């Protein structure tokens, strides 16, 4: 979730080295590998302090970006004990961890609130904590008629006004593939559409923050990014809207799991259950615009209208084939960097 603002790494190494020596401390703690910024603050307020502390469980946040967290999870999977009890990662990274056998299997017996998770988001080794969709976000002052199709991203009248996040190269490539007649298991047509973007002077922006700045200055009028991010920027005063195009959108799910070799597996499972509590879910919705993943988290009607998706829109969500993405990601990145960005 590199879209979230990061804070400096919170050093829990000293604490974790003490855990094996102090059995009570070990049994009353849970170490959560997570993002910082607003995400970490909301976890601290809505899960750590509101739910875990009353149970007598101290939460230590191990804050980092997703790449070092994923690397740590993979590197430690053969160890007798890992350094995290809960790992928070995006769906693609969690797929890889599951395939490598790094995660504890989950069900309603060890995480009771999994029974409230929407069926289309359920998985065997992770919980879906929050979700949104990577879709078209646009400046409502400059584009007064909402886009209807992903092909609008290639409309010559928006020459030089389409911005693309460098970090979201996979999502951008997926949109290009669909626009070119491909599918979630055939990204080959993306190459032609990417080069068309280049000829239309599409701007590649280095970070999520750079996309926000480009919207604010009106350097760009349109991008592909999480609808939740558009909501947050709109709340900050930038006139933005989002649409789920008639061809669909790329869902993005942020998940949490318990490593198989977690020191405090029981507390880790309790933490996953707490993340699915309605109050914790609605707090993320109000602050960050991400949609709850459980059926009993009820949003304010106005907020629901702004951030949620209709059943018809959900039906149009693409179904990413993570095995395909894992197989071809290096090739996609190479084309993105060498040919498209050039």
Where do the language-model regions lie?
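N-terminal secretory signal peptides and thylakoid transit peptides that target proteins
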Residues: 1-17
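Mature extracytoplasmic/periplasmic domains
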Residues: 25, 178, 259-319
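Early extracytoplasmic/lumenal segment of secretory-pathway proteins
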Residues: 26-91
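Extracytoplasmic ligand-binding site segments that recognize negatively charged/polar headgroups
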Residues: 37-44, 67, 82-219
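A ligand-binding cleft/hinge motif common to bilobed small-molecule-binding domains
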Residues: 94-98, 216, 221-239
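Periplasmic-binding protein-like
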Residues: 131-132, 192-197, 236-260
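A bilobed periplasmic-binding-protein/Venus flytrap-type ligand-binding module shared by bacterial periplasmic
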Residues: 135-142, 177-180, 252-265, 283
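Extracellular/periplasmic bilobal clamshell ligand-binding domains
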Residues: 302-342
């Amino acid at each position: 979730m590199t879209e979230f603002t990061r804070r400096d790494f919170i050093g829990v190494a000293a604490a974790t080295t003490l855990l094996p020596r102090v059995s009570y401390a070990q049994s009353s703690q849970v170490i959560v590998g997570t993002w910082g910024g607003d995400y970490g603050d909301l976890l601290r307020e809505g899960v750590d302090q509101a739910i875990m502390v009353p149970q007598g469980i101290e939460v230590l946040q191990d804050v980092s970006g997703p790449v070092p967290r994923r690397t740590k999870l993979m590197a430690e999977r053969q160890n007798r004990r890992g350094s995290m009890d809960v790992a928070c990662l995006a769906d693609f990274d969690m797929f890889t961890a599951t395939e490598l056998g790094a995660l504890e299997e989950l069900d309603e017996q060890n995480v009771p609130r999994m029974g409230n998770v929407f069926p289309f988001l359920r998985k065997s080794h992770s919980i879906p904590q929050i979700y949104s969709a990577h879709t078209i976000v646009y400046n409502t002052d400059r584009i007064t008629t909402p886009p209807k199709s992903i092909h609008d991203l290639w409309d010559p009248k928006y020459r030089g006004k389409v911005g693309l996040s460098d970090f979201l190269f996979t999502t951008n490539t997926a949109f290009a593939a669909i626009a070119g007649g491909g599918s979630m298991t055939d990204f080959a047509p993306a190459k032609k559409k990417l080069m068309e973007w280049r000829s239309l002077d599409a701007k590649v922006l280095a970070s999520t923050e750079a996309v926000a700045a480009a919207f604010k200055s009106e350097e760009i009028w349109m991008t592909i990014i999480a609808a939740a991010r558009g909501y947050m920027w709109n709340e900050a005063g930038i006139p933005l809207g989002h649409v789920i195009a008639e061809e669909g959108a790329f869902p993005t799910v942020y998940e949490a799991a318990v490593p198989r070799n977690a020191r405090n597996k029981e507390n880790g499972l309790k933490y996953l259950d707490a993340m699915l509590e309605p109050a914790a879910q609605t707090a993320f919705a109000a602050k960050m615009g991400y949609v709850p993943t459980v059926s009993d988290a009820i949003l304010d009607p106005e907020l629901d209208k702004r951030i949620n998706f209709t059943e018809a829109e959900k039906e149009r969500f693409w179904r990413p084939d993570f095995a395909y993405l894992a197989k071809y990601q290096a090739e996609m990145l190479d084309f993105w960097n060498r040919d498209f960005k050039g």
